[in-house]
């Protein structure tokens, strides 16, 4: 909903929407000074929770220098990995992801309970919300972890290079679908993109067909044939 003639107001921890009275809300953070509220988008999760996304507009010249000096830049390379989501060129502490697999047993248990309920009954609706809350918890854990990891990387490095891999195509593969969706690599890459832009830094997308694994890191020689079973590449 767009802001027109003061139809949307935000005061402290309250918000007023068109055709709705004042509603108490939990504000995530305060907007920066000098910004103007442009629109509000209200969404509802399957668990029954409501969220309001407030869009503010303004202009800032910060971090928009014409010439960037990367002579002393700290550079990080990131490669997608099925186990652990990613492999980094520098040592970065990571906790074990796979939040779906961690909660898979509990989710399956709640889904079995739902399958035994009579469709349309009160117990069915109640159990539906329990299943939705399980999915919501998994999404929240994954998003929180990726936000913290991407923030740590953008604070430490000036240039981040990532593989421009087609995540949708990989998720359609027979054996990779669950791992690809559970890792959240596409979401992680998007977070890096806008967070680096905020700080005036750069995200470089490397072509998916670039032979980075076949190329020697010292002399640059490319090994033409490199099997997936070869985990160590010794350049001659």
Regions found by a protein language model. Name each.
Residues 16-19, 31-36, 44-236:
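Positively charged, helix-rich recognition surfaces that bind polyanionic ligands
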Residues 1-43:
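Acidic carboxylate diad motif detector
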């Amino acid at each position: 909903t767009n802001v027109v003639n003061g139809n949307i107001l935000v005061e402290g921890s309250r918000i007023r929407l068109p055709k709705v009275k004042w509603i108490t809300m939990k504000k995530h953070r305060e907007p920066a000074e000098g910004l103007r509220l442009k629109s509000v988008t209200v969404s509802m999760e399957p668990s029954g929770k409501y969220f309001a996304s407030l869009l503010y507009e303004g202009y800032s010249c910060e971090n928009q220098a014409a010439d960037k000096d990367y002579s002393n830049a700290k550079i990080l390379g990131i490669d997608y990995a099925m186990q652990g989501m990613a492999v980094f060129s520098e040592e970065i502490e990571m906790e074990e992801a796979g939040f779906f697999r961690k909660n898979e047993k509990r989710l399956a248990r709640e889904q079995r309970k739902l399958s035994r309920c009579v469709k349309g009954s009160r117990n069915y609706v109640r159990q539906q919300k329990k299943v939705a809350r399980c999915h919501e918890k998994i999404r929240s854990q994954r998003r929180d972890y990726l936000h913290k990891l991407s923030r740590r990387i953008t604070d430490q490095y000036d240039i981040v290079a990532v593989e421009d891999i087609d995540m949708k195509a990989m998720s359609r593969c027979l054996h990779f679908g669950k791992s690809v969706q559970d890792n959240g690599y596409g979401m992680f890459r998007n977070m890096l993109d806008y967070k680096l832009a905020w700080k005036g830094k750069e995200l470089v997308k490397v072509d998916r067909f670039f032979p980075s694994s076949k190329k020697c890191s010292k002399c640059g020689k490319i090994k033409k044939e490199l099997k997936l079973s070869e985990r160590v590449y010794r350049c001659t």
